[in-house]
Amino acid sequence: STPNGEEERIFLNIAEVGFGAEVVIRMNNVGRFAGSKLAYPLSLLSCLFSYRKRPVEVHWGNNKQSVPALTNLAVANGRFFGRGLQPAPQAQVDDGLFDILLIEGLSAIKIATRFPALKDGPPPGEPGMTEFQTQSILVTGPATVGVEADGETLGNLPASFSVLPNELFVVRP
């Protein structure tokens, strides 16, 4: 925990705020009843019809953006997650930066039609999708907006994410 008593968690790959976190929350609940193979598609389908976009504020560097209808925010250290999706195809785990994909205002139909495109990364210039890099980011908004990291439910907003450069030493053959 931090000096302020806040819980501190470490993630290696990708954290999400909004839609993706809701899918993970439901997947953890549905998986107990539907089995592991059906948990993800059932949770995704359920969220497509029930997820409500909410207003949030995103702070990074000297920037602040009000997002009136957050669909999803991915904080990516790695490139891939969720069965081959690439929210951040340029992400590098050793560059000291998060690659952020902010998706706002997309309806369930638009999410469903654009979801397959994330296999190759977000389409360039896609309306409602903003990409940027930062060392840290703070997301504030209603306490009902979920947060997940590496497939684990972390709780709800507010949430802050900071890169810990050169903290993990990996040996590969």
Write out the residue ranges for each language-model feature.
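Glycine-rich phosphate/pyrophosphate-binding beta-alpha loops
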Residues: 16, 20, 74-88, 153
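Active-site/binding-pocket entry motifs
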Residues: 17-18, 29, 79-81, 106-108, ...
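Short acidic/glycine-rich loop or secondary-structure boundary segments that cap or lie
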Residues: 20-23, 66-68, 81-84, 108-111
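Short, surface-exposed, charged loop/turn segments at secondary-structure junctions
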Residues: 29-31, 88-91
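A generic local structural motif
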Residues: 43, 58-61, 85-87, 123-125
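ATP/nucleoside-binding phosphotransfer catalytic cores, i.e., glycine-rich phosphate-binding loops
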Residues: 60-67, 92-93, 98, 102-173
